[in-house]
Amino acid sequence: MSGARLRVVGAARLAPGQSQTFEFEQAAEPVPGFVLCHASAGLVAYLNRCPHWSVDLDLGDGRFYAEDIDRIYCKNHGALFRVEDGVCDHGPCLGQSLERCAVELEGDDAWVSLTRQS
């Protein structure tokens, strides 16, 4: 996925705790992801795939963040991920990470780079 960028319209207007999904096509296959606004981490973006079984985290409802525990969560397995780096700190994929995407702001929009970021 090197060099691919996608504009996520309006993502810079998200309030803390809100997310917006996006989908990129790579080799005619959908690559789903999400941008999340976090109170301290700002805008972060990850691919919508749990490292445990490579399934969507949100079960299709577009909600990824649990404010009461300050974690991104997988609704399939209950895995919890730190917002700032995507590392699982609870659940079946402990120590594994979500695939992070780079985010650049441009006005009210965000450009998401689907090149893997560490």
Where are the regions a protein language model picked out?
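Short cysteine clusters
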Residues: 50, 74-77
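N-terminal pre-ligand scaffold of iron-sulfur
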Residues: 1-67, 82-83, 97-118
